[in-house]
Amino acid sequence: MARYVGRFAPSPSGPLHFGSLIAALGSYFQAKANNGIWLVRIEDLDPPREMPGASQLILEALKAYQLHWDGEVVYQSERHGLYQAQIDAWLDNGDAYYCQCTRKQIKEHGGFYPGTCRDKNLKEGAIRLKMTKPVARFLDQKHGMIEIPEQLVNEDFIIKRRDGLFAYNLAVVLDDIDQGVTEVVRGADLIEPTGRQISLYQILGQPEVSYLHLPLAMDDNGNKLSKQNHATAIDIENPKPALLHAMTFLGFDVPEEIKAASMNEILSWGCENWRLEQLPSEIEITPRFSNGTV
């Protein structure tokens, strides 16, 4: 049986906040409870959205919380050659094509791309992958079978944007394959692209990974804690309170004697007592798909 390989893959749009700590802890506990390895990958694909120095702040925060990763940190900004080579191969054999449709035009079709440019033989624009392996549902390790809207299932999706930036779905799958990831543990806000990512595994002829989506931390206004919503950075000078708060959020009932222990002892206890059944069953946010419908 292959060894468990998990990962935490934040984007450097700001320092770690409580919501991203949940994702880091959940992926860490799941990996270590399965006697696996835990990788860290910085998903710096979108420079306009990134904050200078955020990558280092994220790594420093993980160290402060005693979340020590295995191996070297991988940066997506250093892996463009991998992504472009795959795109070129698809373009050469006709599995991908250029598209010049605008967001307005797609919105006029209900928010889903109907394949307008598939047979136009254009030479520039965004690049879309022909959907030859549609995935209508997938099994989440906590939430069971997740159904995906039919229009989204069959959509030829973008793998490289018209501005030259590589699409998240392509990069994350190529990296997970390259790094040998066996299970993806992340926030429930990323349920939406999972079907497309499974399609990519199938198109690439690669064994699929399993998925576990963690409940999301919300603010008082019902918005997901995120850098875009100006979520407060976690305290790295006195990390224990936030660590214990995050563990409670993940369903742990931490004994008083463990609360008084060192950070390493708390994390070791967490690895020994991690159970998927203890996770809150609520996703905390309704998964929303491309056209704004559930």
Curated annotation (Swiss-Prot):
It is an enzyme of class 6 (ligase). L-glutamate binds at R7, F8, A9, P10, S11, E43, Y168, R186. Pfam families: tRNA-synt_1c (PF00749). Binds 1 zinc ion per subunit. A motif ('HIGH' region) lies at residues 10-20. Zn(2+) binds at C99, C101, Y113, C117. Keywords: Aminoacyl-tRNA synthetase, ATP-binding, Ligase, Metal-binding, Nucleotide-binding, Zinc. GO terms for biological process: glutamyl-tRNA aminoacylation; tRNA modification. The keyword Nucleotide-binding applies. Belongs to the class-I aminoacyl-tRNA synthetase family. GluQ subfamily. This is Glutamyl-Q tRNA(Asp) synthetase. It comes from Vibrio parahaemolyticus serotype O3:K6 (strain RIMD 2210633). The lineage of its organism: Bacteria, Pseudomonadati, Pseudomonadota, Gammaproteobacteria, Vibrionales. The gene is gluQ.
